[in-house]
Amino acid sequence: MYSFNTLRFYLWETIVFFSLAASKEAEAARSAPKPMSPSDFLDKLMGRTSGYDARIRPNFKGPPVNVSCNIFINSFGSIAETTMDYRVNIFLRQQWNDPRLAYNEYPDDSLDLDPSMLDSIWKPDLFFANEKGAHFHEITTDNKLLRISRNGNVLYSIRITLTLACPMDLKNFPMDVQTCIMQLESFGYTMNDLIFEWQEQGAVQVADGLTLPQFILKEEKDLRYCTKHYNTGKFTCIEARFHLERQMGYYLIQMYIPSLLIVILSWISFWINMDAAPARVGLGITTVLTMTTQSSGSRASLPKVSYVKAIDIWMAVCLLFVFSALLEYAAVNFVSRQHKELLRFRRKRRHHKSPMLNLFQDDEGGEGRFNFSAYGMGPACLQAKDGISVKGANNNNTTNPPPAPSKSPEEMRKLFIQRAKKIDKISRIGFPMAFLIFNMFYWIIYKIVRREDVHNK
């Protein structure tokens, strides 16, 4: 009986103990704080009750905020010489530390927030100093990213398309190398409050397989600081320089080769008979007009600049060679017809000789109407009115050399035609050689000398 009562006592004591333990655990579970929901956490971090003010920068009245910038280029193109600008699509990423956003209450190491939360935090007032036009992307939603880390680091990424000014030096066009810049600057905060700097690794990244229609984007990126000084203070500024080397394929096909063929075509007139005036004149005028049109077309897509470009020199020299070929035929035609002018001059001269000259000339035997030998004048020269000398008798017995026999009209015609043909023969060699020498100097200067000058800048 005693053992049974003892056993029942111990059993009752055990039940009471476990009941008390269970009740304490339930009470502890009820009294333990519930895990904070994301909404409650954000309200506590940057809501109205948090004391966070997006109008005030981090470290207010303290050291400036350092903002690390990074650019990822999605596309690069639409480089326009007439407006001197270029179009680029980029991801702009900014990172800074805001101690007010550091947290320990939430288990995640970082929070990716909705873009609508951007209005609730402070952001740098970055703008592009050489921007001519820009727009954000909102398809299918705002292309923006906001990420907050446990230590208060903030990552702000945004996708934008920019049209940026790019002053170009077209002296070497179309063998030029252009440098286009992108300047990132603070609009309102001076360097006492905000400093921009490039990210140490991969500050400027380019999408794989990115190609440009007319340019080669060189791999080296020139990153610089461009601090601006205004009346309102000194403002932070950073810039990236993109070196673009123009490809000549399009211009060789559209400008250089056609103009070269037109110049060669103008040389065909040197092998055409000089008597075929319609053919040679028609060919010369056609090549001149074609070359003029080609020269005008080469300037259609370029701005009206005050200096001379490489393409202008090429077109001007080609036009000069074509026009010179036309003038060459004018010279050939003029020389070949000179014998007619000479014969006409001779006939005119004989027609205007004084009739008195016949009184002083001997008739085959020296017995003319007046025989000056009888008067002792000898072979002296009497000067007629038109300058014709007549032999007299008192010239100290000296005689003038007999006049050279004049050439016949046919001989004169052949002489001048040979001279004209000689001009054509010289032109057949002279024009190509002169154009070849010009090409040697042209390509050496623009492809080697000036290119080295550009790279050394």
UniProtKB/Swiss-Prot annotation:
Q: Which residues lie on this side of the membrane: Cytoplasmic?
A: 273-277, 331-425
Q: What reaction is this protein's catalytic activity?
A: chloride(in) = chloride(out)
Q: List the Gene Ontology MF annotations in alphabetical order.
A: extracellularly glycine-gated chloride channel activity; glycine binding; ligand-gated monoatomic ion channel activity involved in regulation of presynaptic membrane potential; taurine binding; transmembrane signaling receptor activity; transmitter-gated monoatomic ion channel activity involved in regulation of postsynaptic membrane potential; zinc ion binding
| Tissue expression pattern | Detected in spinal cord neurons. Detected in brain stem neurons. Detected at lower levels in hippocampus and cerebellum. Detected in the inner plexiform layer of the retina (at protein level).
The record's GO CC annotations read: chloride channel complex; dendrite; external side of plasma membrane; glycinergic synapse; inhibitory synapse; intracellular membrane-bounded organelle; membrane; neuron projection
Q: Check the record and name the Gene3D superfamilies matching this protein.
A: Neurotransmitter-gated ion-channel ligand-binding domain, Neurotransmitter-gated ion-channel transmembrane domain
Per the UniProt entry, the disulfide pairs are C166-C180, C226-C237
Q: Which disease is it linked to?
A: Defects in Glra1 are the cause of the spasmodic (spd) phenotype, a mouse mutant which resembles the human neurological disease, hyperekplexia (or startle disease (STHE)). Defects in Glra1 are the cause of the lethal oscillator (spd-ot) phenotype. Mutant mice display a fine motor tremor and muscle spasms that begin at 2 weeks of age and progressively worsen, resulting in death by 3 weeks of age. Heterozygous mice show an increased acoustic startle response. Neurons from homozygous oscillator mice have dramatically reduced amplitude and frequency of glycinergic inhibitory postsynaptic currents.
Q: Which family does it belong to?
A: Belongs to the ligand-gated ion channel (TC 1.A.9) family. Glycine receptor (TC 1.A.9.3) subfamily. GLRA1 sub-subfamily.
Q: Which PANTHER family match?
A: NEUROTRANSMITTER GATED ION CHANNEL
Any idea what this protein is called? Glycine receptor subunit alpha-1
